[in-house]
Amino acid sequence: MTKSVDDLARGDQAGDEQDPVHREQQTFGDNPLEVRDTDHYMHEYVGGFVDKWDDLIDWKKRYESEGSFFIDQLRARGVETVLDAAAGTGFHSVRLLEEGFETVSADGSPQMLAKAFSNGLAYNGHILRVVNADWRWLNRDVHGEYDAIICLGNSFTHLFSERDRRKTLAEFYAMLKHDGVLIIDQRNYDSILDTGFSSKHTYYYAGEDVSAEPDHIDDGLARFKYTFPDKSEFFLNMYPLRKDYMRRLMREVGFQRIDTYGDFQETYGEDEPDFYIHVAEKSYRTEDEFVDMYSNAVHTARDYYNSEDADNFYYHVWGGNDIHVGLYQTPQEDIATASERTVQRMAGKVDISPETRILDLGAGYGGAARYLARTYGCHVTCLNLSEVENQRNREITRAEGLEHLIEVTDGSFEDLPYQDNAFDVVWSQDSFLHSGDRSRVMEEVTRVLKPKGSVLFTDPMASDSAKKNELGPILDRLHLDSLGSPGFYRKELTRLGLQNIEFEDLSEYLPVHYGRVLEVLESRENELAGFIGEEYRAHMKTGLRNWVQAGNGGSLAWGIIHARA
Protein backbone atom coordinates (compact mmCIF):
# COMPACT_ATOMS: atom_id res chain seq x y z
CA MET A 1 0.00 0.00 0.00
CA THR A 2 1.31 3.45 -0.89
CA LYS A 3 1.95 5.66 2.13
CA SER A 4 0.67 9.20 2.39
CA VAL A 5 2.90 12.06 3.46
CA ASP A 6 1.21 11.96 6.86
CA ASP A 7 2.03 8.26 7.10
CA LEU A 8 5.66 9.04 6.34
CA ALA A 9 5.74 11.68 9.04
CA ARG A 10 4.20 9.40 11.67
CA GLY A 11 6.13 6.27 10.73
CA ASP A 12 4.63 2.81 10.38
CA GLN A 13 3.46 2.81 14.00
CA ALA A 14 2.50 6.36 14.93
CA GLY A 15 3.10 7.04 18.58
CA ASP A 16 5.55 4.17 19.09
CA GLU A 17 8.47 5.69 20.98
CA GLN A 18 10.75 2.92 19.67
CA ASP A 19 10.15 4.13 16.13
CA PRO A 20 13.12 6.36 15.17
CA VAL A 21 10.86 8.53 13.04
CA HIS A 22 8.62 9.37 15.97
CA ARG A 23 11.34 9.58 18.63
CA GLU A 24 12.51 13.06 19.59
CA GLN A 25 15.85 11.95 21.06
CA GLN A 26 18.73 10.34 19.21
CA THR A 27 20.14 7.00 20.36
CA PHE A 28 23.78 6.03 19.95
CA GLY A 29 24.10 3.37 22.64
CA ASP A 30 26.74 3.23 25.35
CA ASN A 31 29.63 4.17 23.04
CA PRO A 32 28.65 6.56 20.22
CA LEU A 33 32.10 6.27 18.63
CA GLU A 34 31.46 2.60 17.89
CA VAL A 35 28.38 3.43 15.80
CA ARG A 36 29.69 3.13 12.25
CA ASP A 37 26.78 1.62 10.41
CA THR A 38 25.02 2.80 7.26
CA ASP A 39 21.52 2.05 8.55
CA HIS A 40 21.96 4.06 11.75
CA TYR A 41 21.06 7.36 10.04
CA MET A 42 17.40 6.47 10.70
CA HIS A 43 18.14 6.81 14.42
CA GLU A 44 19.87 10.15 13.88
CA TYR A 45 17.31 12.12 11.84
CA VAL A 46 14.69 12.09 14.58
CA GLY A 47 11.77 14.48 14.68
CA GLY A 48 13.37 17.02 16.97
CA PHE A 49 16.45 17.29 14.75
CA VAL A 50 14.51 17.45 11.49
CA ASP A 51 12.32 20.25 12.85
CA LYS A 52 15.45 22.34 13.41
CA TRP A 53 17.25 21.41 10.18
CA ASP A 54 16.12 24.47 8.26
CA ASP A 55 17.51 26.68 11.03
CA LEU A 56 20.90 25.13 10.27
CA ILE A 57 20.66 25.60 6.51
CA ASP A 58 18.86 28.98 6.34
CA TRP A 59 17.21 28.69 2.93
CA LYS A 60 17.61 32.37 2.06
CA LYS A 61 21.34 32.46 2.78
CA ARG A 62 21.87 29.09 1.13
CA TYR A 63 20.17 30.42 -2.00
CA GLU A 64 22.45 33.47 -2.02
CA SER A 65 25.65 31.51 -1.38
CA GLU A 66 25.02 28.88 -4.08
CA GLY A 67 23.94 31.40 -6.65
CA SER A 68 23.12 29.64 -9.91
CA PHE A 69 25.94 27.06 -9.70
CA PHE A 70 23.84 23.89 -9.79
CA ILE A 71 21.27 25.37 -12.17
CA ASP A 72 24.04 26.39 -14.58
CA GLN A 73 25.61 22.91 -14.43
CA LEU A 74 22.30 21.29 -15.30
CA ARG A 75 21.27 23.71 -18.03
CA ALA A 76 24.68 23.51 -19.69
CA ARG A 77 23.97 19.81 -20.23
CA GLY A 78 20.39 20.20 -21.43
CA VAL A 79 18.92 18.56 -18.33
CA GLU A 80 15.13 18.39 -18.03
CA THR A 81 14.47 15.63 -15.48
CA VAL A 82 16.20 15.46 -12.09
CA LEU A 83 16.17 12.98 -9.23
CA ASP A 84 17.02 14.73 -5.97
CA ALA A 85 18.29 11.61 -4.21
CA ALA A 86 18.97 13.28 -0.86
CA ALA A 87 16.05 15.70 -0.75
CA GLY A 88 16.29 16.40 2.97
CA THR A 89 13.85 19.17 3.84
CA GLY A 90 13.41 20.04 0.17
CA PHE A 91 15.63 23.06 -0.45
CA HIS A 92 17.08 21.87 -3.76
CA SER A 93 13.87 20.17 -4.90
CA VAL A 94 11.96 23.42 -4.49
CA ARG A 95 14.75 25.37 -6.17
CA LEU A 96 14.73 22.99 -9.14
CA LEU A 97 10.96 23.21 -9.51
CA GLU A 98 11.17 27.00 -9.39
CA GLU A 99 13.68 26.83 -12.26
CA GLY A 100 11.44 24.60 -14.38
CA PHE A 101 13.07 21.19 -13.92
CA GLU A 102 10.86 18.11 -13.64
CA THR A 103 11.95 16.85 -10.23
CA VAL A 104 11.41 13.76 -8.08
CA SER A 105 12.42 14.05 -4.42
CA ALA A 106 13.77 10.93 -2.70
CA ASP A 107 15.21 10.42 0.76
CA GLY A 108 15.78 7.59 3.19
CA SER A 109 14.27 9.55 6.07
CA PRO A 110 10.46 9.66 6.12
CA GLN A 111 10.55 12.58 8.54
CA MET A 112 12.74 14.57 6.15
CA LEU A 113 10.37 13.85 3.26
CA ALA A 114 7.36 15.00 5.28
CA LYS A 115 9.16 18.23 6.09
CA ALA A 116 10.14 18.64 2.43
CA PHE A 117 6.53 18.18 1.31
CA SER A 118 5.26 20.82 3.73
CA ASN A 119 8.07 23.17 2.72
CA GLY A 120 7.11 22.75 -0.92
CA LEU A 121 3.56 23.83 -0.16
CA ALA A 122 4.81 26.78 1.86
CA TYR A 123 7.05 27.98 -0.98
CA ASN A 124 4.67 28.96 -3.80
CA GLY A 125 2.43 25.92 -3.37
CA HIS A 126 4.72 23.33 -4.96
CA ILE A 127 3.54 19.75 -4.58
CA LEU A 128 6.69 17.66 -4.34
CA ARG A 129 6.73 14.13 -5.78
CA VAL A 130 8.31 12.43 -2.77
CA VAL A 131 9.60 8.85 -2.58
CA ASN A 132 10.96 7.12 0.51
CA ALA A 133 13.93 5.22 -0.91
CA ASP A 134 17.12 3.48 0.15
CA TRP A 135 19.90 4.28 -2.33
CA ARG A 136 21.12 0.69 -2.32
CA TRP A 137 17.79 -0.38 -3.81
CA LEU A 138 17.06 2.81 -5.73
CA ASN A 139 15.91 1.05 -8.92
CA ARG A 140 13.40 -0.88 -6.84
CA ASP A 141 12.00 2.15 -5.03
CA VAL A 142 12.15 4.81 -7.76
CA HIS A 143 11.12 4.28 -11.37
CA GLY A 144 12.33 5.83 -14.60
CA GLU A 145 15.53 7.30 -16.00
CA TYR A 146 16.78 10.81 -15.37
CA ASP A 147 18.93 13.39 -17.09
CA ALA A 148 20.54 14.20 -13.75
CA ILE A 149 20.79 12.86 -10.22
CA ILE A 150 21.88 15.13 -7.39
CA CYS A 151 23.00 13.91 -3.98
CA LEU A 152 23.77 17.00 -1.91
CA GLY A 153 24.06 18.11 1.70
CA ASN A 154 27.03 15.84 2.52
CA SER A 155 24.57 12.94 2.42
CA PHE A 156 26.75 10.34 0.71
CA THR A 157 28.96 10.22 3.80
CA HIS A 158 26.24 8.33 5.69
CA LEU A 159 27.42 5.20 3.84
CA PHE A 160 29.98 3.49 6.05
CA SER A 161 30.93 0.42 4.00
CA GLU A 162 32.67 0.51 0.64
CA ARG A 163 30.21 -2.11 -0.56
CA ASP A 164 27.33 0.26 0.18
CA ARG A 165 29.11 3.15 -1.54
CA ARG A 166 29.81 1.14 -4.68
CA LYS A 167 26.28 -0.24 -4.80
CA THR A 168 24.79 3.23 -4.41
CA LEU A 169 26.93 4.68 -7.19
CA ALA A 170 25.98 1.74 -9.41
CA GLU A 171 22.30 2.46 -8.73
CA PHE A 172 22.81 6.13 -9.57
CA TYR A 173 24.64 5.19 -12.77
CA ALA A 174 21.90 2.78 -13.84
CA MET A 175 19.14 5.35 -13.35
CA LEU A 176 20.83 8.01 -15.46
CA LYS A 177 20.19 8.32 -19.17
CA HIS A 178 23.12 7.54 -21.46
CA ASP A 179 24.36 11.14 -21.34
CA GLY A 180 23.28 11.90 -17.78
CA VAL A 181 25.17 13.68 -15.01
CA LEU A 182 25.59 12.93 -11.32
CA ILE A 183 26.34 15.74 -8.86
CA ILE A 184 27.54 14.76 -5.39
CA ASP A 185 28.93 17.00 -2.69
CA GLN A 186 30.93 16.24 0.45
CA ARG A 187 32.70 17.99 3.26
CA ASN A 188 36.39 18.64 2.79
CA TYR A 189 37.38 15.76 5.04
CA ASP A 190 40.93 15.81 3.65
CA SER A 191 41.56 19.12 5.37
CA ILE A 192 39.82 18.05 8.59
CA LEU A 193 41.82 14.81 8.82
CA ASP A 194 45.14 16.35 7.85
CA THR A 195 45.14 19.79 9.47
CA GLY A 196 42.09 20.01 11.73
CA PHE A 197 38.66 21.59 11.40
CA SER A 198 38.00 25.12 10.28
CA SER A 199 34.94 26.48 8.55
CA LYS A 200 33.96 29.71 6.88
CA HIS A 201 30.34 28.67 7.68
CA THR A 202 29.38 30.52 4.52
CA TYR A 203 28.07 28.25 1.78
CA TYR A 204 26.28 25.24 3.19
CA TYR A 205 25.32 25.67 6.83
CA ALA A 206 24.65 29.39 6.87
CA GLY A 207 22.16 29.66 9.72
CA GLU A 208 22.99 32.22 12.39
CA ASP A 209 23.56 31.15 15.99
CA VAL A 210 23.80 27.53 14.85
CA SER A 211 27.07 25.62 14.98
CA ALA A 212 28.18 22.47 13.16
CA GLU A 213 31.57 21.17 14.24
CA PRO A 214 33.31 17.84 14.77
CA ASP A 215 32.96 16.09 18.12
CA HIS A 216 35.34 13.30 17.06
CA ILE A 217 37.43 12.60 13.96
CA ASP A 218 39.41 9.54 12.92
CA ASP A 219 40.00 7.79 9.60
CA GLY A 220 36.75 5.85 9.91
CA LEU A 221 34.41 8.28 11.66
CA ALA A 222 33.47 11.94 11.53
CA ARG A 223 31.06 12.61 14.39
CA PHE A 224 29.60 16.11 14.12
CA LYS A 225 27.74 18.02 16.80
CA TYR A 226 24.99 20.49 15.87
CA THR A 227 24.09 23.10 18.48
CA PHE A 228 21.01 25.33 18.20
CA PRO A 229 20.05 28.61 19.91
CA ASP A 230 17.86 26.80 22.47
CA LYS A 231 21.01 24.89 23.56
CA SER A 232 19.71 21.62 22.12
CA GLU A 233 22.38 19.34 20.66
CA PHE A 234 22.19 16.67 18.00
CA PHE A 235 24.85 14.45 16.43
CA LEU A 236 25.53 12.76 13.10
CA ASN A 237 27.99 9.90 12.61
CA MET A 238 29.46 9.97 9.09
CA TYR A 239 32.29 8.41 7.14
CA PRO A 240 35.10 10.91 6.31
CA LEU A 241 35.43 10.49 2.55
CA ARG A 242 38.63 11.74 0.99
CA LYS A 243 38.23 13.65 -2.26
CA ASP A 244 40.41 11.49 -4.51
CA TYR A 245 38.94 8.28 -3.09
CA MET A 246 35.47 9.52 -3.98
CA ARG A 247 36.58 10.43 -7.49
CA ARG A 248 38.11 6.98 -7.92
CA LEU A 249 34.90 5.23 -6.88
CA MET A 250 32.91 7.21 -9.45
CA ARG A 251 35.40 6.38 -12.20
CA GLU A 252 35.38 2.70 -11.36
CA VAL A 253 31.59 2.60 -11.57
CA GLY A 254 31.85 3.98 -15.11
CA PHE A 255 31.57 7.76 -15.03
CA GLN A 256 33.69 9.15 -17.84
CA ARG A 257 34.55 12.69 -16.81
CA ILE A 258 34.63 14.00 -13.25
CA ASP A 259 35.20 17.66 -12.40
CA THR A 260 35.59 18.68 -8.78
CA TYR A 261 34.83 22.17 -7.49
CA GLY A 262 35.67 23.70 -4.12
CA ASP A 263 32.85 25.82 -2.68
CA PHE A 264 31.46 26.25 -6.23
CA GLN A 265 34.85 27.33 -7.68
CA GLU A 266 36.90 25.48 -10.32
CA THR A 267 40.13 26.43 -8.56
CA TYR A 268 40.57 26.73 -4.85
CA GLY A 269 44.21 27.35 -4.10
CA GLU A 270 45.30 28.82 -0.80
CA ASP A 271 41.96 28.97 1.00
CA GLU A 272 40.69 25.48 1.77
CA PRO A 273 37.07 24.96 0.68
CA ASP A 274 34.53 23.76 3.22
CA PHE A 275 32.89 21.49 0.65
CA TYR A 276 33.76 19.72 -2.59
CA ILE A 277 31.24 19.25 -5.40
CA HIS A 278 31.84 16.41 -7.89
CA VAL A 279 30.19 16.68 -11.31
CA ALA A 280 30.38 13.27 -13.03
CA GLU A 281 29.29 12.66 -16.62
CA LYS A 282 28.09 9.26 -17.80
CA SER A 283 28.37 9.90 -21.55
CA TYR A 284 30.95 7.59 -23.13
CA ARG A 285 33.58 9.11 -25.39
CA THR A 286 35.72 7.37 -27.98
CA GLU A 287 39.49 7.79 -28.00
CA ASP A 288 39.10 10.48 -30.68
CA GLU A 289 37.00 12.49 -28.21
CA PHE A 290 39.38 12.24 -25.23
CA VAL A 291 39.96 16.00 -25.23
CA ASP A 292 36.32 16.45 -24.19
CA MET A 293 37.04 14.33 -21.10
CA TYR A 294 39.99 16.35 -19.82
CA SER A 295 39.59 17.55 -16.25
CA ASN A 296 39.55 21.26 -15.48
CA ALA A 297 43.17 21.12 -14.29
CA VAL A 298 44.28 19.41 -17.50
CA HIS A 299 42.34 21.88 -19.65
CA THR A 300 44.04 24.74 -17.80
CA ALA A 301 47.49 23.27 -18.42
CA ARG A 302 46.68 22.50 -22.06
CA ASP A 303 45.46 26.02 -22.76
CA TYR A 304 48.54 27.46 -21.09
CA TYR A 305 51.11 25.36 -22.95
CA ASN A 306 49.29 25.87 -26.25
CA SER A 307 49.47 29.65 -25.89
CA GLU A 308 51.87 31.54 -28.15
CA ASP A 309 53.63 33.24 -25.25
CA ALA A 310 54.22 29.99 -23.36
CA ASP A 311 55.44 28.17 -26.46
CA ASN A 312 57.88 30.94 -27.31
CA PHE A 313 59.10 31.15 -23.71
CA TYR A 314 59.81 27.44 -23.30
CA TYR A 315 61.25 27.11 -26.78
CA HIS A 316 63.54 30.16 -26.74
CA VAL A 317 64.34 30.58 -23.03
CA TRP A 318 64.07 27.13 -21.49
CA GLY A 319 65.94 25.53 -24.37
CA GLY A 320 63.33 24.21 -26.79
CA ASN A 321 64.34 20.61 -26.15
CA ASP A 322 63.82 19.74 -22.48
CA ILE A 323 61.28 21.44 -20.22
CA HIS A 324 62.35 20.26 -16.78
CA VAL A 325 64.70 21.00 -13.90
CA GLY A 326 68.38 20.54 -14.68
CA LEU A 327 71.34 19.26 -12.66
CA TYR A 328 73.88 22.09 -12.60
CA GLN A 329 77.61 21.81 -12.08
CA THR A 330 77.70 25.60 -11.68
CA PRO A 331 74.81 28.06 -11.21
CA GLN A 332 75.69 29.72 -14.54
CA GLU A 333 75.77 26.52 -16.58
CA ASP A 334 73.78 26.38 -19.79
CA ILE A 335 70.16 25.31 -19.17
CA ALA A 336 70.15 22.78 -22.01
CA THR A 337 73.30 21.05 -20.76
CA ALA A 338 72.01 20.82 -17.19
CA SER A 339 68.62 19.57 -18.40
CA GLU A 340 70.16 16.78 -20.47
CA ARG A 341 72.22 15.76 -17.44
CA THR A 342 68.94 15.06 -15.62
CA VAL A 343 67.88 12.74 -18.45
CA GLN A 344 71.22 10.93 -18.29
CA ARG A 345 70.97 10.53 -14.51
CA MET A 346 67.50 9.04 -14.79
CA ALA A 347 68.38 6.71 -17.65
CA GLY A 348 71.23 5.28 -15.60
CA LYS A 349 68.76 3.91 -13.06
CA VAL A 350 67.14 1.37 -15.42
CA ASP A 351 68.32 -1.20 -17.96
CA ILE A 352 67.46 -0.01 -21.47
CA SER A 353 67.98 -1.96 -24.69
CA PRO A 354 66.60 -1.73 -28.25
CA GLU A 355 63.74 -4.01 -27.11
CA THR A 356 62.68 -1.67 -24.30
CA ARG A 357 59.39 0.16 -24.75
CA ILE A 358 59.23 3.48 -22.89
CA LEU A 359 56.22 5.74 -22.31
CA ASP A 360 57.17 9.39 -21.71
CA LEU A 361 54.29 11.22 -20.01
CA GLY A 362 54.17 14.98 -20.43
CA ALA A 363 56.94 14.71 -23.01
CA GLY A 364 56.96 18.40 -23.95
CA TYR A 365 59.25 18.96 -26.93
CA GLY A 366 60.52 15.37 -26.74
CA GLY A 367 64.11 16.00 -25.68
CA ALA A 368 64.26 13.01 -23.34
CA ALA A 369 62.61 10.72 -25.89
CA ARG A 370 65.14 11.64 -28.56
CA TYR A 371 68.06 11.16 -26.16
CA LEU A 372 66.78 7.70 -25.19
CA ALA A 373 66.05 6.62 -28.77
CA ARG A 374 69.35 7.98 -30.06
CA THR A 375 71.43 6.48 -27.24
CA TYR A 376 69.79 3.09 -26.75
CA GLY A 377 67.87 2.47 -29.97
CA CYS A 378 64.69 1.88 -27.94
CA HIS A 379 61.13 2.74 -28.88
CA VAL A 380 59.60 5.72 -27.05
CA THR A 381 55.97 6.79 -27.03
CA CYS A 382 55.48 10.45 -26.14
CA LEU A 383 52.15 11.47 -24.64
CA ASN A 384 51.56 15.18 -24.10
CA LEU A 385 48.48 17.40 -23.84
CA SER A 386 49.82 20.41 -25.77
CA GLU A 387 49.25 20.02 -29.48
CA VAL A 388 51.61 22.94 -30.12
CA GLU A 389 54.49 21.24 -28.29
CA ASN A 390 53.66 17.93 -29.92
CA GLN A 391 53.94 19.46 -33.39
CA ARG A 392 57.39 20.85 -32.54
CA ASN A 393 58.34 17.42 -31.17
CA ARG A 394 57.33 15.70 -34.41
CA GLU A 395 59.22 18.21 -36.55
CA ILE A 396 62.45 17.97 -34.53
CA THR A 397 62.21 14.18 -34.34
CA ARG A 398 61.72 13.97 -38.10
CA ALA A 399 64.68 16.29 -38.70
CA GLU A 400 66.89 14.01 -36.59
CA GLY A 401 65.71 10.90 -38.43
CA LEU A 402 64.21 9.29 -35.33
CA GLU A 403 60.56 9.10 -36.36
CA HIS A 404 60.81 5.29 -36.70
CA LEU A 405 61.58 5.05 -32.97
CA ILE A 406 59.40 7.82 -31.55
CA GLU A 407 55.61 8.10 -31.62
CA VAL A 408 53.94 11.32 -30.47
CA THR A 409 50.36 11.22 -29.13
CA ASP A 410 48.03 14.02 -28.05
CA GLY A 411 46.52 13.09 -24.71
CA SER A 412 46.28 13.36 -20.93
CA PHE A 413 48.07 11.15 -18.44
CA GLU A 414 44.86 11.03 -16.39
CA ASP A 415 43.33 8.79 -19.12
CA LEU A 416 46.01 6.91 -21.01
CA PRO A 417 44.89 5.59 -24.42
CA TYR A 418 46.97 2.40 -24.10
CA GLN A 419 46.38 -1.23 -23.23
CA ASP A 420 47.32 -2.71 -19.87
CA ASN A 421 50.89 -4.01 -19.44
CA ALA A 422 52.14 -2.18 -22.54
CA PHE A 423 55.43 -0.55 -21.43
CA ASP A 424 58.67 -1.62 -19.77
CA VAL A 425 59.35 1.86 -18.41
CA VAL A 426 56.94 4.70 -17.65
CA TRP A 427 58.94 7.92 -17.60
CA SER A 428 57.98 11.50 -16.78
CA GLN A 429 59.76 14.74 -15.99
CA ASP A 430 58.14 17.59 -14.08
CA SER A 431 54.65 17.04 -15.47
CA PHE A 432 52.48 15.39 -12.84
CA LEU A 433 52.16 18.62 -10.86
CA HIS A 434 49.70 19.83 -13.52
CA SER A 435 47.19 17.10 -12.69
CA GLY A 436 44.31 17.77 -10.36
CA ASP A 437 44.12 14.04 -9.59
CA ARG A 438 47.59 12.57 -9.09
CA SER A 439 46.18 9.42 -7.52
CA ARG A 440 44.45 8.77 -10.82
CA VAL A 441 47.71 9.38 -12.69
CA MET A 442 49.53 6.81 -10.55
CA GLU A 443 46.75 4.30 -11.20
CA GLU A 444 47.05 4.82 -14.94
CA VAL A 445 50.85 4.59 -14.76
CA THR A 446 50.75 1.23 -12.99
CA ARG A 447 47.99 -0.05 -15.28
CA VAL A 448 50.06 0.32 -18.45
CA LEU A 449 53.30 -0.90 -16.82
CA LYS A 450 54.50 -4.42 -17.64
CA PRO A 451 55.22 -6.89 -14.83
CA LYS A 452 58.74 -6.19 -13.50
CA GLY A 453 58.67 -2.82 -15.25
CA SER A 454 59.92 0.47 -13.79
CA VAL A 455 58.30 3.81 -13.03
CA LEU A 456 60.80 6.65 -13.23
CA PHE A 457 59.88 10.31 -12.81
CA THR A 458 60.69 13.72 -11.40
CA ASP A 459 58.15 16.26 -10.21
CA PRO A 460 58.33 19.62 -8.44
CA MET A 461 56.72 18.74 -5.11
CA ALA A 462 55.86 20.13 -1.72
CA SER A 463 58.29 18.94 0.90
CA ASP A 464 56.78 16.49 3.37
CA SER A 465 56.98 19.16 6.07
CA ALA A 466 55.61 22.05 3.99
CA LYS A 467 52.56 23.99 5.14
CA LYS A 468 50.01 24.86 2.52
CA ASN A 469 50.10 28.59 3.18
CA GLU A 470 53.79 28.54 2.24
CA LEU A 471 52.86 27.28 -1.22
CA GLY A 472 50.07 29.78 -1.88
CA PRO A 473 51.82 31.92 -4.53
CA ILE A 474 52.96 28.83 -6.45
CA LEU A 475 49.56 27.14 -6.33
CA ASP A 476 47.80 30.31 -7.41
CA ARG A 477 50.18 30.68 -10.34
CA LEU A 478 49.51 27.09 -11.48
CA HIS A 479 45.75 27.22 -10.74
CA LEU A 480 46.11 24.17 -8.50
CA ASP A 481 44.94 23.35 -4.99
CA SER A 482 47.94 21.21 -4.07
CA LEU A 483 51.28 19.72 -5.08
CA GLY A 484 52.39 16.14 -4.65
CA SER A 485 55.06 15.28 -2.10
CA PRO A 486 57.63 12.50 -1.73
CA GLY A 487 55.44 10.97 0.98
CA PHE A 488 52.34 11.18 -1.19
CA TYR A 489 53.96 9.40 -4.13
CA ARG A 490 55.48 6.74 -1.87
CA LYS A 491 52.07 6.08 -0.33
CA GLU A 492 50.28 5.90 -3.69
CA LEU A 493 52.87 3.67 -5.34
CA THR A 494 52.83 1.35 -2.33
CA ARG A 495 49.02 1.23 -2.44
CA LEU A 496 49.20 0.19 -6.08
CA GLY A 497 51.60 -2.66 -5.37
CA LEU A 498 54.91 -1.24 -6.55
CA GLN A 499 58.09 -2.17 -4.71
CA ASN A 500 61.61 -0.93 -3.99
CA ILE A 501 60.46 2.68 -4.07
CA GLU A 502 63.43 5.04 -4.03
CA PHE A 503 63.60 8.82 -3.92
CA GLU A 504 66.91 10.43 -4.80
CA ASP A 505 66.54 13.82 -3.16
CA LEU A 506 67.95 16.49 -5.47
CA SER A 507 65.93 19.37 -4.04
CA GLU A 508 68.89 21.74 -3.92
CA TYR A 509 68.88 21.92 -7.74
CA LEU A 510 65.31 23.23 -7.96
CA PRO A 511 65.95 26.84 -6.85
CA VAL A 512 69.21 26.83 -8.82
CA HIS A 513 67.33 25.90 -11.98
CA TYR A 514 64.53 28.42 -11.60
CA GLY A 515 67.05 31.07 -10.68
CA ARG A 516 69.01 30.29 -13.85
CA VAL A 517 65.88 30.53 -16.01
CA LEU A 518 65.10 33.88 -14.39
CA GLU A 519 68.61 35.15 -15.18
CA VAL A 520 68.28 34.16 -18.84
CA LEU A 521 64.84 35.75 -19.12
CA GLU A 522 66.04 39.03 -17.63
CA SER A 523 69.27 39.13 -19.64
CA ARG A 524 67.40 38.64 -22.94
CA GLU A 525 64.46 40.89 -22.11
CA ASN A 526 64.87 43.23 -25.09
CA GLU A 527 65.33 40.38 -27.56
CA LEU A 528 62.32 38.45 -26.23
CA ALA A 529 60.00 41.46 -26.23
CA GLY A 530 59.31 40.91 -29.91
CA PHE A 531 57.57 37.56 -29.48
CA ILE A 532 56.74 37.13 -25.76
CA GLY A 533 54.20 39.56 -24.32
CA GLU A 534 55.14 41.98 -21.55
CA GLU A 535 52.40 40.76 -19.21
CA TYR A 536 53.48 37.14 -19.65
CA ARG A 537 57.12 38.01 -18.98
CA ALA A 538 56.21 39.97 -15.85
CA HIS A 539 54.08 37.15 -14.47
CA MET A 540 56.75 34.60 -15.33
CA LYS A 541 59.45 36.54 -13.48
CA THR A 542 57.22 36.76 -10.42
CA GLY A 543 56.50 33.04 -10.64
CA LEU A 544 60.17 32.12 -11.00
CA ARG A 545 61.08 34.22 -7.96
CA ASN A 546 58.38 32.41 -5.97
CA TRP A 547 59.85 29.04 -6.97
CA VAL A 548 63.34 30.16 -5.95
CA GLN A 549 62.15 31.54 -2.62
CA ALA A 550 60.08 28.46 -1.73
CA GLY A 551 62.88 26.14 -2.84
CA ASN A 552 65.49 27.92 -0.74
CA GLY A 553 63.05 28.02 2.18
CA GLY A 554 62.62 24.24 2.25
CA SER A 555 58.95 24.20 1.24
CA LEU A 556 59.64 22.40 -2.05
CA ALA A 557 61.18 19.06 -2.94
CA TRP A 558 62.46 17.65 -6.20
CA GLY A 559 64.32 14.53 -7.21
CA ILE A 560 64.10 11.21 -9.02
CA ILE A 561 61.48 8.69 -7.91
CA HIS A 562 62.05 5.10 -9.04
CA ALA A 563 59.69 2.20 -8.33
CA ARG A 564 59.39 -1.33 -9.69
CA ALA A 565 56.37 -3.46 -10.43
Curated annotation (Swiss-Prot):
User: Which residues take part in binding substrate?
Assistant: 154, 187, 226
Q: Has the keyword Ribonucleoprotein been applied to this entry?
A: no
Q: Which domain of life is it from?
A: Bacteria
A GO molecular-function term, please? Answer: dimethylglycine N-methyltransferase activity
Q: Basic and acidic residues bias: where?
A: 1-10
Q: Which Pfam families match?
A: Methyltransf_11, Methyltransf_25
According to its record, what are the GO cellular component terms? cytosol
Q: Name one GO biological process term.
A: methylation
- Other observations noted: Functionality of the enzyme could be demonstrated only partially. When the complete gene was expressed in E.coli, little activity is detected and most of the protein is found in the cell pellet. Truncated versions of the protein were designed, encoding the GSMT and SDMT moieties separately: the SDMT was successfully expressed in soluble active form, but expression of the truncated GSMT was still not successful.
Protein name per UniProt: Glycine/sarcosine/dimethylglycine N-methyltransferase
